[in-house]
């Protein structure tokens, strides 16, 4: 009984150390960026979601619809939303943003990428863990929470772009 308890404790300690090592490893990386103008496809692991590839049903999330006009403050609203959600901005190029999120306990880093497609009037999102296999649904939940927050801003952005009508 005592031996089993010691073995179980050693296995648990080894597992916790392994998680801290994975967390440290995830800090050495960056988002994949745009590949031929689109967000990268998700790897064959469950810890990634992306709105670019609807045929990849396992990883697919719906892109965020944006109005045809009223996108003047869209980029700043996206950045502010990411920061409000606890993300750190990593890169910004034109209509592309990359950010990272870190877990509190083990410091796992996830990449969060956004591509604004003004021609199709959508925002594409990709959220993926840098290491490991399972994320317990964290990336999907993050992408969905981001989508809800940005979607709630759309009516006010569209209204702010409509010029006030003055006297004749």
Predicted features by range, described:
Residues 3-7, 17-168:
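Ser/Thr-rich, low-complexity intrinsically disordered terminal regions
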């Amino acid at each position: 009984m005592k031996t089993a308890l010691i073995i179980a404790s050693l296995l648990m300690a080894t597992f916790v150390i392994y998680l801290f090592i994975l967390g440290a490893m995830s800090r050495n990386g960056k988002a994949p960026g745009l590949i031929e103008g689109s967000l990268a496809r998700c790897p064959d692991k469950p810890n990634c979601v992306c709105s670019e590839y609807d045929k990849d049903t396992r990883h697919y999330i719906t892109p965020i619809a944006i109005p045809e006009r009223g996108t003047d403050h869209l980029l700043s609203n996206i950045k502010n939303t990411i920061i409000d959600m606890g993300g750190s901005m990593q890169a910004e190029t034109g209509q592309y943003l990359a950010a990272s999120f870190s877990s509190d306990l083990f410091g796992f880093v996830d990449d969060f990428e956004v591509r604004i497609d003004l021609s199709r009037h959508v925002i594409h999102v990709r959220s993926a863990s840098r290491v490991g296999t399972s994320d317990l649904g964290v990336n999907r939940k993050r992408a969905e929470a981001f989508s809800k927050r940005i979607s709630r801003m759309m009516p006010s952005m569209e209204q702010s772009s409509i010029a006030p009508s003055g006297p004749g």
